[in-house]
Design a protein with these regions (language model features):
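Catalytic-core segments of hydrolase enzymes
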Residues: 213-214, 219-225
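Solvent-exposed loop/turn segments at secondary-structure junctions
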Residues: 151-153, 174-177, 225-226
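Secreted/periplasmic carbohydrate-active enzymes, especially glycoside hydrolases
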Residues: 1-155, 159-168, 204-210, 219-220
């Protein structure tokens, strides 16, 4: 999504570089306009990855990652830029004869061996402490982390899971936060009752999914707890 924060219309180029190849797409934005710009392999052949390096979890293969550099240029000058890291993998689920859900990673069954994660109660975790904890998970020969809530004060811990090959079963905002979200008290059964409440919570979940959507480590969102 591109946003023109200025009071004047602008014309520029959205430039992307992936694996040493570059594409450029012209974009026009009115003053104050936000626009979702979709680019597929039809417009940019560089996005068609032939024989991609697949992302695998710990003990199943390498956790291959790609990096795409994006920039928006106006009259040849960079207005904004960002590097997006992502992985290529396929995740599917299935049910056993007993009715339990299982997962397939790149077509192969994966036995999920998971640790649980909660943030430090005073939010004192740093990138260094996050990395130490993620390394502990790997050293215990586990391949997954279950975030009961949408933990992590930034994307750092999710970046680490991508790098170290740990599957992520991410949660959602817990019941005790709903009072602040909804602006009213909730009983033991929750407080999402009106259409307005439902729309608010749906937008909240949508924003969280968009925030983390590029992480190959994330294989499922569990909106229920325990």
């Amino acid at each position: 999504q591109l946003t023109n924060e200025s009071e004047q219309a602008v014309k520029g180029q959205l430039i992307g570089t992936l694996e040493g190849k570059t594409f450029s797409i012209p974009v026009s934005l009115a003053a104050g306009e936000s626009k979702i710009v979709r680019v597929t392999s039809k417009e940019a052949d560089v996005l068609h990855l032939k024989n991609p390096r697949l992302w695998w979890c710990h003990n199943m293969g390498k956790s291959e990652m790609y990096g795409m550099d994006l920039a928006f240029e106006i009259d040849g000058k960079v207005s904004d830029k960002e590097t997006i890291n992502f992985g290529v993998r396929e995740v599917r689920d299935y049910f056993t004869e007993e009715g339990y859900r299982g997962f397939l990673l790149n077509g192969k069954k994966v036995l999920v061996r998971s640790a649980g994660w909660t943030d430090d109660i005073f939010l004192r975790d740093t990138p260094a402490s996050n990395e130490i904890q993620v390394q502990y998970v790997r050293d215990m020969n586990l391949n997954s982390i279950r975030f009961e809530n949408i933990w992590g004060t930034s994307q750092n811990v999710y970046d680490l899971c991508d790098r170290y090959g740990l599957l992520v079963l991410v949660g959602w905002s817990c019941h005790w936060e709903w009072d602040n979200y909804l602006g009213s008290s909730c009983d033991e059964f929750g407080g999402i009752k009106s259409e307005k409440d439902m729309n608010l919570i749906a937008r909240s979940l949508n924003d969280q999914v968009l925030w983390l959507r590029n992480h190959p480590a994330i294989i499922a969102w569990f909106v229920g707890s325990d």
